[in-house]
Each structure stands twice: as structure tokens, then as C-alpha cells.
């Protein structure tokens, strides 16, 4: 009877395992399909959701796996089922399927921990593409290639390698063989323990031994895979530095001598350091090779014009003038001709058209002769194309450049479109070179009027039909950009914030800088650049800007006296030596705040908070708190004073009011362990306003007013939501005695 009950339980578990595997495969297929698409914000959120779903499914499957392991240790499993069938094999098969899913989830977990365009992600992609992504292969199929050659073949193969590389190859091959032998012994020992009958007195000991054996086997396989990768690098001859190789050799010796007891597990970063060092050396070599190639090519061009001797070409003067005119239009940079090592530079800003034309024709003739000679002399030397780093190469980290701004906005107004609307077109002045009769070259800078006249003289003016489409496209782009920008700013009154800044007794530089509301919209990098330039004017009367004497890439040159010291942008550099750690979720709020301020979407954020509040649903409370934290982030950590003022006004609109820390006045009504200004600076703050912003209160329920309780009229009792800056949290205080004398009743009219 008990066997039938056990068999029924196993069948139920089998059914649940199949359902769990189907759900896991379904989520993983969706995850893989999104993984191959572009990494925009929507896809990123979907990938995170699918990763969480996969985590839930794998946890269920792991519970079933533990149950299967328990059943496999039971002898009654061998007698279950009809004759010719064995439940033991079915249990082992299901256990194997679950373990395959666990390995798949490890890949998902590894990918989810890496940022899309981080240096680590790019480097790992590069290493996988060059070394082979065989971290998850448990077979030894490639061992035959590593150990198949004879001693004579190996000597011929390694003849070009340095002695250190050959010694390392032999040592690592021996190490792989020893690791394989130890793994086989551990597998045999594990099978013996698994077949041993379990009793209460030896159950814990056997399980501990099995876990230790499994851990050692995993470490052995890890070292084998990494050593195979390293052997490929050594045999290819790309390893030039052996310091880390010898460190690895010492650790491997200790690990092999102790049969895996030495603490050299898969958590080590020594292999990654070695591979990164190899990649860095390859990158440096490629850059040096390219520089040498460019230098040699330029040296050939210079020698062709040395000592002032030129070979006359068979081309006519008209053909030479035509070729040189094309060169002048396509490349505004001058072609310098050397003679006896002397170069003359002459700046010509004015002159008659006739003189300019005669000189221009002379320039064309001499330039064509020198260019024809250089082309003839260098034709025998095939110039190799300059190689650019691949997307998977670590060199791409150093050569990444910002993308150019699009000609017109696509969809909603972007950073680049808003910036491009205010950039005027600048026409550079081309430089031309005239070769004098005595062999020395004359370097001339031609004025804009002369250049336009020369261009018109050489090529006919474009027709009206050619000019009209370009003009219409430019006007359409400008009108579209301006209309989008105006529609964005229509829903917010910026004048009241400008008025507050004007009333703040700022210096002329600060007033002009912070009164520009566009500074509150641009990306953080542009804000940093503009504020850093303004702070270098060294005005002793600055109220907000700071000229820091030390460079700190993580701090802005700002100090806002109207905010607490612990949230100052330059808090780490010169104002205090204490260590205040910002809460981790601020990164998320920073991203949300940057999106909101980019298109002045503050009212949209307000409407969302209000609509969720009106629903009176308890499930919406975490979402409301998250959105409110975004406004608090803008108030405390917004870069410009305009951002702080905008966030403050919307917090007041939601019913939040700053409340002074009463511990400074002898009362301890807020016992939340907050940090006072006296604790930070050692004395009272000079600005009383900054002490008001450690707490914000929002009334949830009014219990009674002060008059009803025999208290002054400025007192009331109720339930309040409280935002605590020191802990960055919102909690509720019930039956709190609220004193309006410690409360700011309306948004700020001035910064100080």
C-alpha cells in the first residue's frame, strides 16, 4: 500500500516537472527573441520581467530536484512500476532535465548582471569571440587536438615561441592531465558514496562528503576550461607577459598537490586578469603598427619632394588645373611642398580679384605637378588600409565617440534635435599654398569673399531648381523643431521660477547662467560642462558656484546653501570629511528625473500621481511612493536651482511641506535618528533654511485642532506621512502633534 502511495506521489511530481519545464522553455524562448533585438527601454524592462519569471520557475524545479534526490536514495524506488520498467531511471532522467534548465538559467543570470554597453560587457564579448565561448561545455572533445601531436611535431610547432611560452605550455598540459585524472577518481568515489546505504548516524557525514566532492569536481572542470583557453593563446604566440602566468603556475601547483583542498576555486579572477592583459597587449601592438605604417607612408611622401627637385609630368596645364580645382573643392586643407627645408606662411585677407585669379592658376599648376609626382613615386608601394577596431574589441572602448546630431527630430523632441536648432552654420576658410620660384612654399589664408569668388569663377552657380529643395527641407526642419519645443514648454510657467532666481541676490554670472531654463533640460554631461566653465571665472562673490582647487570627476562645482550639506554636489571634495552614502535606488530616480526634465513632463508626472491617489487602492501605494521619490530627487539632487524650485513647487501642490528638525530647539518630536547640521559641521549652520529640509510632512488624517484640545491655534493633531532625508524613506506617524511654526507654508520666493 505504501509503495502504491509513493508511486502516485512520484507520478504527480513528474507531471509538475513537465509543466514547469514547459513554462521555463516558453519564458526562455521569449527572452532569447528579445535578446537579439535592439536594447531600448521597453525591451530592457521586458527582459527583466522574463528573467524574474525564469527565476521563479527554476526555484520550483529545484525543489522538485531535491525531492528526486531524496527518492533516489530510497531502496523502495527500485521495486516500483510494472516489470521491465524502472522508476529510478525516470527519476534520473527528470533530474537531468532540471539540471539542464539550471545551466540555462545561469547564462540568463550572467547576462542580466551586465550592463549593455559597459566596459565589462564589451570585454567579455571580445574574449568570447576570440577565445571561444566554451565555458559551459562539459565535454573533452577538444582534448584530442591539444594532446594529439608527438614530441617531434611539438618541437617543430613551438620552435618560433619563446622558451617561457614553451615551458608554460608543457606545464599546463600536464596540469590538465592531472586534473582529469583527479576528476575521474572523484567521480568514482562519488558513485561509491551514492550507492552506500544511508543511516541516521552517517547521513550528515555522507552528504557533506558528496557536496565537497561535487564542489571539487566543479573547480577541476573550471580550471581545465580556462587552461585550454590559455593554451590556445600560448600556442598562437600572442602571450608576451609571463608574470601572471607564473602566479597561476604557483597556485595550480598547490591546488594539484592538495588534491583540490587549496583555496583556488572558480571565484578567482586570475584567469580574467591574464586574458585582459593579453587583449591589452594585442591592442597596443595594433596601435603601434598603425602608427608606424602611417609614419612610414608620410616619410615616403616627404622624401619624394626633398631638395626641391620635381619630375615634370606629361599632363597639360589645363588638365592639371582641372585636377587641382577638384582637389581644392573636396579637401580644404593645403598641400605643402618643401624646398630646402623652408616653409613660408603668409596671411592674405584682401586683394584684387585679378591678382587672386592669377595666383590661383599658378597655385593649381604647381600643386598638380607635385601631386602627380607623389602619385607616381608611391604607386609601387601598396598602402594597406587603416584598420579600425571591431565592435567586439576592447579598443572600441577608447575610440567611442558621440554620435552626430540628426538633421531633424524623429518622433518626440530629442536632446540632439533641441540642440541642433540653435547651432548656426559656420563656413571654414580654406587654406591654399603657392610655390614660389625660389623653391620655398608660401602658406596663404584666403578671405571668405575671395574664396566665394574663386569658387564661382571655377564652377557655375547652382540653378534655382537645385537650391529650392534644400531650402524647403531646412525651413521645414527648423519649423518642426521650433513647434515641438514650444508645445513642450506651453504646459509649464517658467517665469515664476526665473523670478525666484532674480530675487536671490546672485552675481551677474550666476544670474545669467541659472536664469536660462534650457539648462534644466539638457543632458547631465552638458550641464556639468557649462557649470564647470562658469565656475572658472573666479568671482569671490559667487553664492552657488564654487571654484574647486582639486579635480573630482564625481562632483560638480556647486554649493547650494539652501540645501542640507549631505546632499551637496561637491560634498565629497572640500566641505566636509564625513561619509554620507547615498541610497542605491537613487540611480533609478536619477534616470526617471532626467527623462521628465528633458521634455518638461512635470505636469504629466503630477497627473499620474494624483490619478493613482484618487483610486484609493492600497496596491498603488508603492507606485505613488516611487513617483514621489522622483520629485524628492529633483529637489535634493537636481543640478540647477531651477530644477530644485520646480520639484519644490510640485511637492507643495501634492500637499507635502518641509518641517524643521525640532531636535535643535530642545524638542525631540521626531525620534528617527536623523542627522542634524551640528553633527556634520560641528556647529550650527549659518543657513536656517537648510535645516528645514530634513523632513517633509503630508497630512493623511486630521484628528483634532489645537483649539479643541486647549492648545494654541498653530497646533493640530493627526496622522501624517513623513519623508526622512537621512534614511530616504516615507513612513506614517500616527497621532502626531504638528506645529505650524516649524513648517514652511508655501514654495520659496528666494533661494536664500
From Swiss-Prot:
Subcellular locations according to the entry: Cytoplasm; Nucleus
A single GO cellular-component term on record: nucleus
Biased composition (Polar residues): 322-334, 349-358
Bias kind Low complexity: ranges: 365-384, 459-472
Acidic residues biased stretches: 131-160
GO biological process annotation, one example: positive regulation of cell adhesion involved in single-species biofilm formation
InterPro entries in UniProt: Not2/3/5, Not_N
Family stated for the protein in its record: Belongs to the CNOT2/3/5 family.
Binding partners and assembly: Component of the NOT protein complex.
Full protein name: General negative regulator of transcription subunit 3
Organism: Candida albicans (strain SC5314 / ATCC MYA-2876) (Yeast)
Lineage: Eukaryota, Fungi, Dikarya, Ascomycota, Saccharomycotina
Amino acid at each position: 500500500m505504501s509503495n502504491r502511495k509513493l508511486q502516485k506521489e512520484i507520478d504527480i511530481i513528474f507531471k509538475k516537472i513537465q509543466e514547469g519545464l514547459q513554462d521555463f522553455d516558453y519564458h526562455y524562448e521569449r527572452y532569447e527573441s528579445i535578446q537579439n533585438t535592439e536594447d531600448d527601454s521597453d525591451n530592457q524592462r521586458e527582459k527583466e520581467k522574463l528573467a524574474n519569471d525564469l527565476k521563479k520557475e527554476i526555484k520550483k524545479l529545484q525543489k522538485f530536484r531535491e525531492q528526486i534526490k531524496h527518492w533516489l536514495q530510497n531502496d523502495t524506488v527500485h521495486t516500483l512500476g510494472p516489470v521491465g520498467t524502472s522508476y529510478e531511471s525516470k527519476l534520473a532522467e527528470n533530474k537531468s532535465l532540471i539540471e539542464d534548465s539550471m545551466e540555462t538559467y545561469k547564462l540568463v543570470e550572467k547576462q542580466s548582471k551586465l550592463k549593455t554597453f559597459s566596459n565589462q560587457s564589451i570585454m567579455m564579448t571580445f574574449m568570447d569571440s576570440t577565445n571561444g565561448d566554451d565555458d559551459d561545455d562539459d565535454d573533452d572533445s577538444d582534448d584530442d587536438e591539444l594532446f594529439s601531436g608527438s614530441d617531434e611535431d611539438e618541437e617543430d610547432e613551438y620552435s618560433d615561441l619563446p622558451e617561457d611560452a614553451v615551458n608554460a605550455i608543457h606545464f599546463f598540459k600536464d596540469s590538465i592531465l592531472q586534473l582529469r585524472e583527479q576528476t575521474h577518481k572523484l567521480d568514482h568515489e562519488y558513485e561509491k558514496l551514492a550507492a552506500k546505504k544511508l543511516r541516521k548516524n552517517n547521513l550528515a557525514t555522507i552528504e557533506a562528503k558528496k557536496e565537497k566532492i561535487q564542489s571539487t569536481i566543479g573547480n577541476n572542470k573550471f580550471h581545465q576550461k580556462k587552461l585550454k583557453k590559455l593554451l590556445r593563446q600560448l600556442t598562437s604566440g600572442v602571450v608576451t607577459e609571463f608574470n601572471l602566468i607564473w602566479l597561476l603556475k604557483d597556485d595550480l601547483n598547490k591546488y594539484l598537490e592538495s588534491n583540490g583542498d587549496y583555496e583556488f576555486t572558480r571565484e578567482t579572477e586570475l584567469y580574467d586578469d591574464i586574458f585582459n592583459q593579453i587583449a591589452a597587449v594585442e591592442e597596443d601592438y595594433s596601435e603601434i603598427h598603425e602608427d608606424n605604417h602611417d609614419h612610414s607612408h608620410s616619410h615616403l611622401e616627404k622624401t619624394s619632394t626633398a631638395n626641391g627637385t620635381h619630375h615634370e609630368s606629361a599632363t597639360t596645364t589645363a588638365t592639371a588645373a582641372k585636377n587641382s580645382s577638384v582637389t581644392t573643392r573636396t579637401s580644404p586643407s593645403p598641400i605643402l611642398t618643401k624646398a630646402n627645408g623652408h616653409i613660408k606662411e603668409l596671411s592674405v585677407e584682401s586683394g584684387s580679384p585679378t591678382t587672386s585669379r592669377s595666383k590661383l592658376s599658378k597655385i593649381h599648376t604647381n600643386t598638380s605637378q607635385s601631386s602627380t609626382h607623389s602619385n607616381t613615386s608611391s604607386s609601387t608601394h601598396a598602402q594597406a588600409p587603416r584598420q579600425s577596431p571591431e565592435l567586439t574589441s576592447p579598443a572600441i572602448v577608447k575610440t567611442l565617440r558621440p554620435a552626430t546630431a540628426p538633421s531633424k527630430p524623429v518622433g518626440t523632441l530629442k536632446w540632439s534635435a533641441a540642440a541642433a536648432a540653435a547651432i548656426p552654420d559656420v563656413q571654414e576658410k580654406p587654406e591654399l599654398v603657392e610655390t614660389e620660384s625660389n623653391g620655398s612654399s608660401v602658406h596663404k589664408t584666403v578671405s571668405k569673399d575671395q574664396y566665394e569668388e574663386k569658387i564661382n569663377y571655377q564652377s557655375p552657380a547652382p540653378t534655382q531648381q537645385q537650391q529650392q529643395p534644400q531650402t524647403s527641407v531646412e525651413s521645414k526642419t527648423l519649423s518642426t523643431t521650433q513647434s515641438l519645443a514650444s508645445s513642450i514648454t506651453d504646459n509649464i510657467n517658467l517665469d515664476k521660477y526665473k523670478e525666484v532666481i532674480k530675487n536671490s541676490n546672485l552675481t551677474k554670472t550666476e544670474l545669467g547662467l541659472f536664469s536660462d531654463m534650457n539648462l534644466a533640460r539638457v543632458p547631465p554631461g552638458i550641464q556639468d560642462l557649462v557649470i564647470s566653465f562658469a565656475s572658472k571665472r573666479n568671482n569671490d562673490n559667487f553664492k552657488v558656484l564654487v571654484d574647486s582647487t582639486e579635480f573630482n570627476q564625481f562632483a560638480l562645482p556647486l554649493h547650494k546653501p539652501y540645501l542640507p550639506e549631505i546632499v551637496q554636489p561637491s560634498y565629497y571634495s572640500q566641505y566636509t570629511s564625513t561619509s554620507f552614502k547615498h541610497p542605491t535606488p537613487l540611480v533609478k530616480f536619477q534616470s526617471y528625473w532626467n527623462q521628465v526634465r528633458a521634455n518638461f513632463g512635470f505636469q504629466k508626472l503630477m497627473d499620474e500621481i494624483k490619478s493613482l491617489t484618487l483610486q484609493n487602492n492600497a496596491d498603488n501605494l508603492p507606485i505613488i511612493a516611487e513617483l514621489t521619490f522622483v520629485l524628492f530627487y529633483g529637489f535634493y539632487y537636481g543640478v540647477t536651482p531651477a530644477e530644485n524650485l520646480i520639484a519644490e513647487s510640485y511637492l507643495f501642490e501634492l500637499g507635502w511641506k518641509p518641517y524643521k528638525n525640532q531636535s535643535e530647539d530642545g524638542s525631540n518630536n521626531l525620534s528617527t535618528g536623523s542627522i542634524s547640521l551640528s553633527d556634520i559641521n560641528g556647529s550650527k549652520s549659518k543657513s536656517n533654511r537648510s535645516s528645514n529640509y530634513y523632513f517633509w510632512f503630508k497630512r493623511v488624517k486630521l484628528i483634532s485642532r489645537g483649539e479643541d484640545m486647549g492648545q494654541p491655534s498653530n497646533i493640530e493633531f493627526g496622522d501624517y506621512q513623513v519623508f526622512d532625508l537621512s534614511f530616504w524613506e516615507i513612513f506614517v506617524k500616527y497621532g502626531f502633534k504638528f506645529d505650524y511654526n516649524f513648517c514652511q507654508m508655501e514654495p520659496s520666493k528666494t533661494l536664500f
